[in-house]
Every structure is written in C-alpha cells, then in structure tokens.
Amino acid sequence: MTLIHMNIFMAFTMSLTGFLMYRSHLMSALLCLEGMILSLFILVTLTVLNLHLTLAKMMPIILLVFAACEAAIGLALLVKISNTYGTDYVQNLNLLQC
C-alpha cells in the first residue's frame, strides 16, 4: 500500500468517523458523506489509472454523477427541513411528510 493510498484511506476513515459521531445535524452528515465520496472518487481514479483498466474508465465519472445526485437531494432535504422546522436536526427527517 503506497503512501497516497494510505492517506486516501485515512481521509475516508476520518469522514466515516465524523459521520458516525456528528450525525445529529444534517449539514454535518452531508459534509462527511461528501468527504467519503471524494476520497472514494480519488481512490477509484488512481486504481483505474494505475492498473490501466480500459473497461473501467467510466467508473469515476459514474461515481461523480451519483455524488452530485446525492448532494442535490441532501441539500433539497436540508432546505425543506430548515424552512419547515427552523433547525437541521436529523431527527426531524422522521417527521417530514412530503
């Protein structure tokens, strides 16, 4: 395992730890999820480039598309919860009736 891969794995682990510890606010959870997705994107891109996989060159782009969709849906939920309840607590997601 190279130093770059270890740093990316540590970034993913720190984001996962932050997601598990600070999950009471939706904004914190979304930021940690974005950190996880970005570290996965960099790891997949480096793996595809290092192994010269021609069939898997679309995988990082597909991962970015899913990350953009996740961010858009998360921000839409954040705006809806903030407008409805005035806070961004994750516990309000159970009360949201769309």
Curated annotation (Swiss-Prot):
Q: Pfam families of this UniProt entry?
A: Oxidored_q2 (PF00420)
Its membrane topology is listed as: Multi-pass membrane protein
Q: Which Gene3D superfamilies match?
A: 1.10.287.3510
Q: Which residues cross the membrane?
A: 1-21, 29-49, 59-79
**Entry EC number(s):** 7.1.1.2
List the keywords (alphabetical). Answer: Electron transport, Membrane, Mitochondrion, Mitochondrion inner membrane, NAD, Respiratory chain, Translocase, Transmembrane, Transmembrane helix, Transport, Ubiquinone
**According to the lineage, what is the superkingdom?**
Eukaryota
Homology family: Belongs to the complex I subunit 4L family.
Instruction: Quote the protein name from its UniProt record.
Output: NADH-ubiquinone oxidoreductase chain 4L
